[in-house]
Design a protein with these regions (language model features):
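A short, Lys/Arg-rich alpha-helix, primarily the initiator
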Residues: 1-12, 51
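DNA major-groove recognition helix of helix-turn-helix/homeodomain DNA-binding modules
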Residues: 44-60
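Short alpha-helical DNA-recognition segment
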Residues: 17-33
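Non-catalytic, surface-exposed connector residues within folded enzymatic/regulatory domains
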Residues: 1, 43-44
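Short basic helix-loop element that most often maps to the first helix and adjoining turn
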Residues: 7-20, 56
Length: 60
């Protein structure tokens, strides 16, 4: 699975839209949009950190 697909799946698992998700992580909306569209590549380390934060939030 490509990183952009993992990012989309992660966002959808939170129930947030693109704007909410990008604001939650402090990422400019345009950057996030480019990641999801595949125009730019999301750094893998950043995706893993976002996954970790989402997982920790669900546990609390």
């Amino acid at each position: 699975m490509e990183l952009k697909e993992e990012l989309i799946r992660l966002r959808e698992s939170t129930g947030m839209n693109k704007k909410q998700f990008s604001e939650y992580f402090g990422i400019p909306y345009r950057t996030f949009q480019d990641w999801e569209l595949g125009n730019r590549r999301v750094p893998e380390y950043l995706l893993r950190l976002m996954e970790y934060k989402v997982r920790m939030e669900k546990l609390n």
